[in-house]
């Protein structure tokens, strides 16, 4: 992962905006922050440099005692999402600081976005890997089967990494070099060019570059 500061956000959905000469630009609307610094980790105390942030407030009645003690250090009730950003110099941040979208990004910036792809469940090789499949008719009984998965006497086994049916999606995906189309400070919204990983209301980590 990039060793830069970033912000947490929620994937609201997609829409389009229009550029200066009228071109339609597909964008993903992300509710980005505000995030609160919960902990600052350093090489001396934790073995690595990082800034831990919380996003989306949670009622104190929904927080267990261990979480409540941790959140109390930053004078917070609670957060639904707690994540870390690896940074080179954590000394620039203090516990309790608020991180807003306009402090990190502006229109035209290039960022990296991390999310969790949509889970598709157990899928076959055609949907999962794009296999061509077998013959469509004429007595064929393996329209969507993978076909042979190995060799004969040598090596006499299925090789590691063979593409086969299995669980598809629900993976961590990092999309690099995404353009920030617009930042709307009053709404804590950032518009990112193109689609982002994951479903609506999914959590996104946006890294500055």
Swiss-Prot record:
Q: Which InterPro entries match?
A: Ribosomal_uL3, Ribosomal_uL3_bac/org-type, Ribosomal_uL3_CS, Transl_B-barrel_sf
Does the keyword section mention Glycoprotein? Answer: no
Task: Name the cystine pairs.
Answer: none
Q: Name one Pfam family in it.
A: Ribosomal_L3
GO molecular function list = rRNA binding; structural constituent of ribosome
Answer whether the UniProt record assigns the keyword Metal-binding to this protein: no
Q: Which GO terms describe its biological process?
A: translation
Would you tell me the Gene Ontology cellular component terms?
A: cytosolic large ribosomal subunit
Name under which the protein is recorded: Large ribosomal subunit protein uL3
**Where does this protein come from, organism-wise?**
Desulfotalea psychrophila (strain LSv54 / DSM 12343)
